[in-house]
C-alpha cells in the first residue's frame, strides 16, 4: 500500500469511526446490553471457525520459531474462548457509567450546573499477540458508547480478522453501524504511525505492549496516549513482617502468572531479617522453578547453597522479567526500600509486608505508584479483581486514568447549564 493509499485508508477508517460514534453515544443501557448479548451469541455460534483461524496463527507462529510463552499468549482453545465469551456477560451486568450526572449545583445567578458522563468518542487500541483483547476492547468500548479502531499484532491476524467480522455482524444485526468496530488488517507498521496522528477523528490511543511500542506512541502520537502495562513491581519485606505468612504471598506474586505485568520483579528485604529470610525465601521459590538475580549481600548469604543465582547489576533491578526470574536486594531500612522503588519502579504496583501499622502507613504515603498494597500480592492489580470488569489496560500515568482502566476510564464529562434566559452580569 502506497503512502497516499495508506493515508486515504486511515482517513476513511477515522471518518467511519467518528460517524459510528455519534450513533453509539445515545444508546440506552438496555440497547447496549442487547448489543453485547448479540456479540456473545455470535461468537459462540462461530466458535469452530474462530478456532480454525487461530490454528492458522499458531501454525505460522511455530513455523517462525516463536517461543512457547508467545505461542501460549496467542493460543485459543474451546475453553479459553468460552471464558472470553463468558466475560461479556460480566460486562453486561456492570453499571453503565454513561449518562450519570454528578457535581450538580445552582449558582447565585440561578444557573443550574451539572456534569454528565459521556463517551470519549473514538478509541484507537494497538496491541500484540492476544486475540482476547480484540473481544475485550470491543465490548468495553461499545458498553461505553465508543467506536474503536483496533490494530492487533501480526501473530494473531487471522484470529483478529475473523473475530472482528463476527462482532461487526452482531452490530449490524442490532441496526447499528458496523464501523463502530474496525480492524486494521495489515501488519504494515507505517499504519501504526499513521493511526497515532489521526487526531481529527481519534480521541485516545491505548497501546498494550512492550516498552518499544509504548515509546513509539509517546513520541509519535498527536493524540492523547494512555501509557502503561509495563510493570517493574516491587515487594518489600519489612523487619516487622510475619515471615511464615510472607512466603505464600511472595510466591503468589511471582509464580502464579510470571509473564504478566503485575507479577513481582524485585523482592526487597530488610537487612534486620535478611540472614534468615533470604535463604528461606530462595529455597521456597527455588522449588517452584524460580531463578534469582541478587545483590552482593544476598549472594554472600546464598553462596554455596546450590541455588540458581546470578549477581545482579543495576540494570537487573530496572528489568521487567516477565519470567520466573526474580531480583532480590537487601536494603538497610524502609526508607532505603522506598528510595529503590522510586529509582526503578515503572509506577505499576508495589507492596509491603509488615505487621507494623506505622511502617505500612509510611510506605503507602511515600510510594506513588498506581497501586500500593499492604500485606497483599501485587497480582491484584487487575480490572476484574478490582471489580471493574474486564480492563482496557493498566495505566501507569497520572492524567485521565490510573491503574486498571474499566468502563469509567473510557468516558469523560461535559458541563450542562440550565438558565432562564440568563445573561452574565
Curated annotation (Swiss-Prot):
<dbReference type="InterPro" id="IPR000965">
    <property type="entry name" value="GPR_dom"/>
</dbReference>
<dbReference type="Pfam" id="PF00171">
    <property type="entry name" value="Aldedh"/>
</dbReference>
<dbReference type="GO" id="GO:0055129">
    <property type="term" value="P:L-proline biosynthetic process"/>
</dbReference>
<comment type="function">
    <text>Catalyzes the NADPH-dependent reduction of L-glutamate 5-phosphate into L-glutamate 5-semialdehyde and phosphate. The product spontaneously undergoes cyclization to form 1-pyrroline-5-carboxylate.</text>
</comment>
<dbReference type="GO" id="GO:0004350">
    <property type="term" value="F:glutamate-5-semialdehyde dehydrogenase activity"/>
</dbReference>
<protein>
    <recommendedName>
        <fullName>Gamma-glutamyl phosphate reductase</fullName>
        <ecNumber>1.2.1.41</ecNumber>
    </recommendedName>
</protein>
<dbReference type="InterPro" id="IPR016162">
    <property type="entry name" value="Ald_DH_N"/>
</dbReference>
<dbReference type="GO" id="GO:0050661">
    <property type="term" value="F:NADP binding"/>
</dbReference>
<dbReference type="GO" id="GO:0005737">
    <property type="term" value="C:cytoplasm"/>
</dbReference>
<keyword id="KW-0560">Oxidoreductase</keyword>
<keyword id="KW-0963">Cytoplasm</keyword>
<dbReference type="InterPro" id="IPR015590">
    <property type="entry name" value="Aldehyde_DH_dom"/>
</dbReference>
<comment type="pathway">
    <text>Amino-acid biosynthesis; L-proline biosynthesis; L-glutamate 5-semialdehyde from L-glutamate: step 2/2.</text>
</comment>
<comment type="similarity">
    <text>Belongs to the gamma-glutamyl phosphate reductase family.</text>
</comment>
<keyword id="KW-0521">NADP</keyword>
<dbReference type="InterPro" id="IPR016161">
    <property type="entry name" value="Ald_DH/histidinol_DH"/>
</dbReference>
<dbReference type="InterPro" id="IPR020593">
    <property type="entry name" value="G-glutamylP_reductase_CS"/>
</dbReference>
<keyword id="KW-0641">Proline biosynthesis</keyword>
<dbReference type="InterPro" id="IPR016163">
    <property type="entry name" value="Ald_DH_C"/>
</dbReference>
<keyword id="KW-0028">Amino-acid biosynthesis</keyword>
<dbReference type="InterPro" id="IPR012134">
    <property type="entry name" value="Glu-5-SA_DH"/>
</dbReference>
Amino acid at each position: 500500500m502506497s503512502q497516499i493509499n495508506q493515508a486515504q485508508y486511515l482517513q476513511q477508517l477515522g471518518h467511519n469511526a467518528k460517524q459510528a460514534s455519534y450513533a453509539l453515544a445515545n444508546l440506552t443501557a438496555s440497547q447496549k446490553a442487547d448489543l453485547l448479548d448479540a456479540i456473545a451469541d455470535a461468537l459462540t455460534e462461530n466458535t469452530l471457525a474462530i478456532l480454525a483461524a487461530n490454528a492458522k496463527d499458531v501454525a505460522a507462529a511455530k513455523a517462525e520459531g516463536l517461543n512457547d510463552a508467545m505461542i501460549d499468549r496467542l493460543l485459543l482453545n474451546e475453553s479459553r474462548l468460552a471464558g472470553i465469551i463468558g466475560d461479556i456477560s460480566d460486562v453486561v451486568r456492570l453499571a453503565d457509567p454513561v449518562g450519570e450526572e454528578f457535581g450538580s449545583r445552582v449558582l447565585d445567578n440561578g444557573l443550574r450546573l451539572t456534569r454528565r458522563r459521556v463517551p470519549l468518542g473514538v478509541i484507537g487500541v494497538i496491541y500484540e499477540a492476544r486475540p482476547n483483547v480484540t473481544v475485550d476492547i470491543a465490548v468495553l468500548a461499545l458498553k461505553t458508547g465508543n467506536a474503536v479502531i483496533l490494530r492487533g499484532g501480526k501473530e494473531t491476524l487471522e484470529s483478529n480478522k475473523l473475530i472482528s467480522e463476527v462482532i461487526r455482524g452482531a452490530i449490524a444485526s442490532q441496526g447499528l453501524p458496523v464501523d463502530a468496530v474496525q480492524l486494521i488488517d495489515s501488519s504494515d507498521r507505517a499504519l501504526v504511525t499513521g493511526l497515532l496522528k489521526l487526531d481529527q477523528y481519534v480521541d485516545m490511543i491505548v497501546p498494550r505492549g512492550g516498552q518499544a511500542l509504548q515509546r513509539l506512541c509517546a513520541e509519535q502520537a498527536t493524540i492523547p496516549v494512555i501509557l502503561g502495562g509495563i510493570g517493574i513491581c516491587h515487594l518489600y519485606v519489612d523487619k516487622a513482617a510475619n515471615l511464615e505468612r510472607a512466603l505464600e504471598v511472595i510466591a503468589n506474586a511471582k509464580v502464579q502468572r510470571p509473564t504478566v505485568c503485575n507479577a513481582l520483579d524485585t523482592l526487597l528485604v530488610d537487612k534486620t531479617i535478611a540472614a534468615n529470610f533470604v535463604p528461606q525465601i530462595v529455597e521456597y521459590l527455588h522449588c517452584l522453578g524460580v531463578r534469582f538475580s541478587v545483590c552482593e549481600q544476598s549472594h554472600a548469604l546464598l553462596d554455596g547453597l546450590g541455588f540458581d543465582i546470578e549477581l545482579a547489576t543495576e540494570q537487573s533491578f530496572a528489568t521487567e522479567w516477565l519470567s520466573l526470574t526474580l531480583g532480590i536486594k537487601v536494603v538497610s531500612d524502609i526508607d532505603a526500600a522506598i528510595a529503590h522503588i522510586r529509582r526503578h519502579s515503572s509506577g505499576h504496583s508495589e507492596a509491603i509486608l509488615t505487621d507494623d501499622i506505622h511502617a505500612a502507613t509510611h510506605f503507602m504515603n511515600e510510594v506513588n505508584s498506581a497501586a500500593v498494597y499492604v500485606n497483599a500480592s501485587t497480582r491484584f492489580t487487575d480490572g476484574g479483581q478490582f471489580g471493574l470488569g474486564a480492563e482496557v489496560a493498566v495505566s501507569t500515568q497520572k492524567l485521565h486514568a490510573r491503574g486498571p482502566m474499566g468502563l469509567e476510564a473510557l468516558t469523560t464529562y461535559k458541563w450542562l447549564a440550565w438558565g432562564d434566559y440568563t445573561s452574565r452580569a
